[in-house]
Amino acid sequence: RSTAELKFGSSAATLDKYPNYGNLTHVTVSSPEVIWAYEEAMHLPKGIVKATGVSRTDQFYDKEFVESRKQKLYEIMPEAKDKKVILYAPTFRGHVATASSPDRIDFERFCRELGNEYVIVCKHHPFVKNPPIIPEELQHFARDLTKYLSIEDLLCCADICISDYSSLVFEY
C-alpha cells in the first residue's frame, strides 16, 4: 500500500485537484514490483512509471569511482583502512527547522562488542544542524563524516548500512 489515503498521505481527491506530478512524462523506479505504489502515490496513469533501475546508483558499479571514494575515506579516517565500515545514516526527526538525529546510539558498547574489525562512520541528514557528539576517546572507532563526505561516497565505502526509514536504504 502506498501513502495515498493514509493518515499522513494525500487523499485521492486532493491528488486529483492538485496534480503535483502532472507534468511528469517518465518516472524511473528500482523494480517492477514497486511500479503500482508510485502510480498510486503520485496519482500517475499507467505507462509513466518504468522499472529501469535508479540512475543515482550507477556510480556504485564503477570500480574506479568506488575505489576513489574509499581512498578519500582513508585520508579522512585512516583507522578505516583494512576494516569493515559500518555506515550509520538515520534520517532526521521532527520538523525541518528544528531537525534532530537520534542520540541514543551507544558507540562505546559498539566499540567494545565489535572490537578492532570495524569502524562506524556517521552521516546525518542535511537538515540536522546539531548532530550528537561522538566522544573524543572513540574517534578511532566512530566518526561523524557529515561535513566531509557525501552519502554517495559513504555508500560506496560501507560494508554494512544502519538506517531507519531514510530512503537511502533503497540505494544501498
Place the predicted regions along the sequence by residue.
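Active-site and donor-binding regions of nucleotide-sugar-utilizing enzymes
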Residues: 1-67
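Tryptophan-centric aromatic hotspots in well-structured domains and transmembrane helices
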Residues: 42-43, 88, 92, 147, ...
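Conserved catalytic-core segment of nucleotide-activated headgroup transferases in glycan assembly
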Residues: 52-134
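Nucleotide-activated donor-binding/catalytic signature segment of Leloir-type glycosyltransferases, i.e.
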Residues: 128-147
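Short active-site oxyanion
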Residues: 22-27, 119, 157-160
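Helix N-cap/beta->alpha junction signal
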Residues: 30-33, 124-126, 165
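A donor-sugar binding/catalytic signature common to diverse glycosyltransferases
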Residues: 148-172
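Acidic, amphipathic alpha-helical patches
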Residues: 17, 107, 150-151
